[in-house]
């Protein structure tokens, strides 16, 4: 059992070092291109590099987790409150069978966006506003972490 644990720890450390190396490559790309599209990956690499020292700072893990949840789960929470289920990365045949069994409807803009029911411009505007607010929250977190890193 000890040898297995040692191999698992070696594999974990190798992947950690690999992630940092990829982060370094991305940082070079971000410096050269400068368009900001790789900035989040650079941030993630720096957080990996910091390791445990981040836990000792005033910016605790719960704060980051709460903001991540705010960004990624907020639209899902809105759908849930409205009784709508969002399925991501599902095979379409499976979704069709699920809709048939549950009596639900599929809202997809892939083939015929004009057939999607229920979305008014007001709802779409509110959704866009909420996404922008979530993005502002994310930017705030990135700026705060950036201040710690420098």
Swiss-Prot record:
Residue numbers binding Mg(2+): 35
GO molecular function: ATP binding; ATP hydrolysis activity; ATP-dependent protein folding chaperone; unfolded protein binding
Disulfide pattern: none
UniProt KW keywords: ATP-binding, Chaperone, Cytoplasm, Hydrolase, Magnesium, Metal-binding, Nucleotide-binding
Top-level taxon: Eukaryota
Coiled coil: none
GO terms under cellular component: chaperonin-containing T-complex
InterPro entries: Chaperone_TCP-1, Chaperonin_TCP-1_CS, GroEL-like_apical_dom_sf, GROEL-like_equatorial_sf
EC number(s) on file: 3.6.1.-
Binding site for ATP: 36-38
Compartment annotation: Cytoplasm
Enzyme class: hydrolase
Main location: cytoplasm
Catalyzed reactions: ATP + H2O = ADP + phosphate + H(+)
Positions of ADP binding: 36-39
Oligomer status and interactors: Component of the chaperonin-containing T-complex (TRiC), a hexadecamer composed of two identical back-to-back stacked rings enclosing a protein folding chamber. Each ring is made up of eight different subunits: TCP1/CCT1, CCT2, CCT3, CCT4, CCT5, CCT6A/CCT6, CCT7, CCT8. Interacts with PACRG. Interacts with FLCN. Interacts with DLEC1. Interacts with SVEP1.
Function: Component of the chaperonin-containing T-complex (TRiC), a molecular chaperone complex that assists the folding of actin, tubulin and other proteins upon ATP hydrolysis. The TRiC complex mediates the folding of WRAP53/TCAB1, thereby regulating telomere maintenance. As part of the TRiC complex may play a role in the assembly of BBSome, a complex involved in ciliogenesis regulating transports vesicles to the cilia.
Similarity remark: Belongs to the TCP-1 chaperonin family.
Name of this protein: T-complex protein 1 subunit beta
């Amino acid at each position: 059992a000890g040898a297995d644990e040692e191999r698992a720890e070696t594999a974990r450390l190798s992947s950690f070092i690999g992630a940092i190396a990829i982060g370094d490559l991305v940082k070079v790309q971000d410096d050269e291109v400068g368009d900001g599209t790789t900035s989040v990956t650079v941030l993630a690499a720096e957080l990996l590099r910091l390791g445990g020292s981040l836990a000792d700072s005033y910016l605790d893990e719960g704060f980051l987790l709460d903001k991540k949840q705010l960004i990624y789960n907020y639209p899902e929470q809105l759908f849930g409150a409205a009784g709508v289920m969002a399925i991501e990365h599902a095979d379409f045949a499976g979704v069709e069978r699920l809709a048939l069994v549950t009596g639900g409807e599929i809202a997809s803009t892939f083939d015929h966006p004009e057939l999607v029911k229920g979305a008014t411009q007001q709802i779409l505007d509110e959704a866009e506003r909420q996404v922008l607010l979530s993005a502002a929250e994310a930017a705030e977190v990135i700026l705060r972490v950036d201040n710690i890193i420098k």
